[in-house]
């Protein structure tokens, strides 16, 4: 049986192959334990060469990218081509797995409902927040329609997988069967680092600097406060960038020499080493589903502070959380973390207890239960049409 996976992630195409940091071929093994092969519908970006790493297509996995779709603005002039391309993929596949929030995913859900085809969803974030806090006027305009589309896409699904334990399932209930707390973390490290702090304090944050919802502005303002108090701080941003907006903001707050834009870190070992060289990890997001970067930071033994947005409280204890945009509280938490080794040790110990439940084997068992439930629904759907997919 072929499973179609639909999501907006931008895969990079070089010659006849496809590459992605977040969606390497290894990711698809989550689903290939139950389904025979996969077809992927996503956005695409053609590249000449560059960082050709983390191949996504391969054995049992093929791509049919939606070339007409670049951003939500593409819907204005190319909606017909986008709908046609998705419809072809949906009809030629036995099952459809939609990851939301995503525009392609919302469209795929509408098509499935129209042709009465059962589909399942993976809910990894909140649509309204993702668009409202994106940083553009167009994003704010789209936030309510996208929230409506996500609520309906999830409600009408046969099976829903949620990456959080409560937050997303409460926000987006499903009329079908729900599977909660199916984290999308790829690995959980078990590293104990030295928590001593030297003269220079290294603080890290992961997230694209081309969107506002990862809270880079909150981090810059907070670091500015601490630098003004006399601390020698280096704030490192990992992810797409640098963006002109946050470079100018760092300059405005007189911390341009304290803020380092490191860009993407493709290699997993290099990323773990980056974490282990930090004194503190912060995630001041305005919205989150289940933040993998937080789990990776905690697993690498880094004291971690985060906003209480979305599912962050699944991983980070209440004492180390602050409200989104609360620069004052974040500044106080960082200050206390710097001054007290005991506080840092308690942070790591308590947060590690929270992520100890992310046993990858157990998560995969639960994911496979969801996939098997969906596979049975598909079989029943085709048997009602006189087609035996197991023959």
From Swiss-Prot:
Superkingdom: Bacteria
Molecular function as annotated in GO: glycosyltransferase activity
InterPro entries per record: Glyco_trans_1, Glycosyltransferase_grp1
GO biological process: capsule polysaccharide biosynthetic process
Keyword Thylakoid appears in the UniProt entry: no
Pathway this chain belongs to: Capsule biogenesis; capsule polysaccharide biosynthesis
Gene3D superfamilies the record matches: Glycogen Phosphorylase B
Keywords assigned: Capsule biogenesis/degradation, Exopolysaccharide synthesis
Role noted for this protein: Required for the biosynthesis of type 1 capsular polysaccharide.
Name recorded for this polypeptide: Protein CapJ
Organism the protein comes from: Staphylococcus aureus
Lineage, uppermost ranks: Bacteria, Bacillati, Bacillota, Bacilli, Bacillales
């Amino acid at each position: 049986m072929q499973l179609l996976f639909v999501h907006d992630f931008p895969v990079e195409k070089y010659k006849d192959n496809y590459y992605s940091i977040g969606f390497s071929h290894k990711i698809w093994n989550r689903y290939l334990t139950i389904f025979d092969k996969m077809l992927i519908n996503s956005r695409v970006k053609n590249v000449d060469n560059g960082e050709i790493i983390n191949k996504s297509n391969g054995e049992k996995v093929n791509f049919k990218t939606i070339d007409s779709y670049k951003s939500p603005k593409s819907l204005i002039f190319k909606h017909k081509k986008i709908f046609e391309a998705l419809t072809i993929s949906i009809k030629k596949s036995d099952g459809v797995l939609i990851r939301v929030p995503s525009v392609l995913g919302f469209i795929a859900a509408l098509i499935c409902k129209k042709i009465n085809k059962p589909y399942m969803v993976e809910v990894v974030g909140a649509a309204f927040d993702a668009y409202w806090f994106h940083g553009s006027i167009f994003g704010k305009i789209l936030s309510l329609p996208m929230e409506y589309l996500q609520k309906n896409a999830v409600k009408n699904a046969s099976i829903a997988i949620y990456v959080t334990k409560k937050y997303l399932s409460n926000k987006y209930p499903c009329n079908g069967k729900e599977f909660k707390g199916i984290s999308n973390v790829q690995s959980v490290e078990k590293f104990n680092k030295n928590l001593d702090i030297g003269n220079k304090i290294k603080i890290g944050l992961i997230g694209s600097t081309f969107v506002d919802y990862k809270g880079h502005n909150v981090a810059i303002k907070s670091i500015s406060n601490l630098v003004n108090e006399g601390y020698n701080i280096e704030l490192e941003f990992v992810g797409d960038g640098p963006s002109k907006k946050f470079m100018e903001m760092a300059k405005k707050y007189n911390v341009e020499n304290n803020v380092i834009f490191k860009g993407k870190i493709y290699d997993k070992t290099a990323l773990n080493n980056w974490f282990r060289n930090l004194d503190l990890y912060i995630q001041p997001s305005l919205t989150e589903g289940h933040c993998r970067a937080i789990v990776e930071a905690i697993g690498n033994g880094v004291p971690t502070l985060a906003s209480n947005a979305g599912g962050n409280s699944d991983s980070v204890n209440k004492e180390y959380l602050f409200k989104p945009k609360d620069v004052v509280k974040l500044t106080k938490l960082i200050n206390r973390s710097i001054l007290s080794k005991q506080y840092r040790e308690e942070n790591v110990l308590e947060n590690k207890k929270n992520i100890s439940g992310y046993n990858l084997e157990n998560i995969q068992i639960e994911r496979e239960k969801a996939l098997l439930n969906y596979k049975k629904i598909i079989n029943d759907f085709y048997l009602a049409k006189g087609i035996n997919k197991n023959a």
